[in-house]
Amino acid sequence: MDKEKLKAIEAAMGNIEKQFGKGSVMKLGEKNILDIEAISTGCLGMDIALGIGGVPKGRIVEIYGPESSGKTTVALHIIAEAQKNGGVAAFIDAEHALDPSYARKLGVDIDNLIVSQPDTGEQGLEIAEALVRSNAIDIVVVDSVAALVPKAEIQGEMGDSHVGLQARLMSQALRKLAGSINKSNCVAIFINQLREKVGIMFGSPETTPGGRALKFYSSVRLDVRRIDTIKQGDEFLGNRTRVKVTKNKVAPPFKNAEFDIMYNEGISRTGDVLDLGVKEEIVQKSGSWFSYNDVRLGQGRENAKQFLKDNPELLYEIENTIREKYDLPIVKNNIKAEVEDKKEKKAEEV
């Protein structure tokens, strides 16, 4: 570059920093902006699909899908992972439907979880903004966008028309929130429902409420679907779930992850590791038998899952082999602490 041009740019950058503060303008190579930190989702398959080992810090994430597909479960697992690493989490419960006992079973520290149940959409988003601006929050979850009802709609009559009010509210809120979220390095997760457009002949009629702003501002969009029911005899044990990364600004998009969501347990870690182990040929499958090196894990998937649950050393070993393959952080073997935690939880339940 021309020396005079370089001097002029440096002078301009100096003036901008004087006026707007240090860090308001910089060269991309000076700061490791591209080294994006991530919070694990608590599901190895999903961490791999996201490409960076979890949801990106300082970004907006949208989780959407049909009813009872596992959207809130995924969000609660991310909160649990953030808290495990010493993070502070907030949950804006616009649906007024958060179940504390279920959250605890998923590993959420509910004693230190900041919860708000706002009366209006404006109030909920203002609370979220205040928490993000405090720079003390690592993750904030809004459940859900569809339940963020504008004040005018709440105060109006039941049959009144309020066209575009929620979309305007979301657009204005995200314009204000986006910069604060990035500066505070906080993850903002918006859970969203599905709606169907009327009269669509071609293409998907499915859409998400709250306008288009959230689609634009989100760095990651996750489509959560229930694809099957897990049964043992006549007993229903859980759901088989598929997550598709429909938008990803931090890694290649359109990757899928499939895992089990077990009732009263959440995402099955053993099932996730077992499936990935078979996929990566770390775990051998012969007929209905699963084996790892010389160890027989069991006949049938559920029996193999139970064997890994009873032998956490083996589970860690298989998981870390998969993590090494994808350059993800290695999980420390903290079996004694985990066993004690499980005993404490069982004692509390009794």
Swiss-Prot record:
Binding residues annotated for ATP, in chain numbering: G65, P66, E67, S68, S69, G70, K71, T72
In terms of HAMAP family, this protein maps to:
RecA
Cellular compartments annotated: Cytoplasm
Q: What's this protein's family per the entry?
A: Belongs to the RecA family.
> Pfam families per the record?
RecA (PF00154), RecA_C (PF21096)
GO BP terms:
DNA recombination; DNA repair; SOS response
Native species: Clostridium tetani (strain Massachusetts / E88)
Reading the lineage from the top rank, the first entry is Bacteria
Entry's Gene Ontology molecular function annotations: ATP binding; ATP hydrolysis activity; ATP-dependent DNA damage sensor activity; damaged DNA binding; single-stranded DNA binding
Q: Which UniProt keywords apply?
A: ATP-binding, Cytoplasm, DNA damage, DNA recombination, DNA repair, DNA-binding, Nucleotide-binding, SOS response
What GO CC annotations are associated with the protein? cytosol
Q: What does this protein do?
A: Can catalyze the hydrolysis of ATP in the presence of single-stranded DNA, the ATP-dependent uptake of single-stranded DNA by duplex DNA, and the ATP-dependent hybridization of homologous single-stranded DNAs. It interacts with LexA causing its activation and leading to its autocatalytic cleavage.
User: What is this protein called in UniProt?
Assistant: Protein RecA
